[in-house]
Amino acid sequence: NSGGGEGSGMWFGPRL
């Protein structure tokens, strides 16, 4: 969503 990293699919999604 508003993350942009390589973490979980909650707030640190696929660079979205």
From Swiss-Prot:
Which InterPro entries does the UniProt entry name for this protein? Pyrokinin_CS
Query: Principal place where this protein is found?
Result: secreted
The signal peptide annotation in the UniProt record is none
Q: Which GO terms describe its molecular function?
A: neuropeptide hormone activity
Keyword annotations? Amidation, Neuropeptide, Secreted
- Entry's localization field: Secreted
Residue positions, PTM Leucine amide: L16
User: GO CC annotations?
Assistant: extracellular region
Which PROSITE patterns does its entry note? PYROKININ
Q: Does the keyword Chaperone apply?
A: no
- One example of a Gene Ontology biological process annotation: neuropeptide signaling pathway
Write out the function statement from the record: Myoactive.
- Family per record: Belongs to the pyrokinin family.
Its recorded name reads CAPA-Pyrokinin
